Amino acid sequence: MGFTDKGRRGYSRTRRDLLSGASVLALAPHTWFDFSDLSTLFQDADGTTAVAADADPIGKVLDKSGNAHHLTQGTEGARPAYKTGIQGNRAAALGDGGDHLDTAAFTEIAQPNTIFLVARNPAYSGTEVYFDGIASDKRHAAFDYTDQINWFAGSSWGGGVVATESTLYEVVFNGANSPLFENGVGISSGDAGAQALTGITLFGNFEGGGNLSGYIMEFLLFNSALSVANRELVRSYLNEKWKVY
């Protein structure tokens, strides 16, 4: 990372700017959910009651990209919980195996798309989905299955370990050449398929199954194959913030 505090004013500005997320916002993310940012979290789907304390339900999450791709859940019993002090002394959302959050449909975006995910699945069992689309033929998905994380956008391939410890994943959905990075290290590349994307589900699949019993800290989607330098910028922001590795 290269951030060592030696008392220089320049260091403080650099680290503060990185953690502000301003440099990430300048890359024009398509969709951005941050479960440590209380200003974006509400207990109800209408966004009238703010999340304020540990174990509060999360019924709405504002999209920090500015594109208004907000997540909602209208069913009280299917809302993940806000949990404090989970990773890097920051809060995360916890799914109990029966929760999920969904965006409304947005304008279809074709591949390539770059997705960053910070998550933890400490009690992995069977098939558990971190994220998915909202329609059967317009999906980008990540799910734990057969002791590895799998990626799907029409075809499925496995690469990377299950996040029993907090993990920073980044994947470029780019058809037959879809590379995966885990905690900054290139793991593998495979064929994820060529489907476009029209919406996002977190903590489960688009049909309401495969629900995650674990944590999601942050999710970022870019409608492009980010350059190496820009992926490093986003990765640095996420790791400096969440202290994953």
Please tell me what each predicted stretch does:
Residues G21-A22, T103-T107:
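Surface-exposed ligand/attachment interfaces on beta-rich extracellular proteins
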Residues G59-G98, E108-I109, F116-S125, F131-A194:
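Extracellular glycan-interaction surfaces
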Residues G2-T72, Y215-E218, L226, E232-Y245:
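GGW-centered surface loops in extracellular recognition modules
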Residues D34, T114-F116:
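Active-site-flanking beta-strand signature of metal-NTP-handling nucleotidyl enzymes
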Residues L101-A104, E128-F131, F203:
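Beta-strand-rich extracellular passenger or scaffold domains
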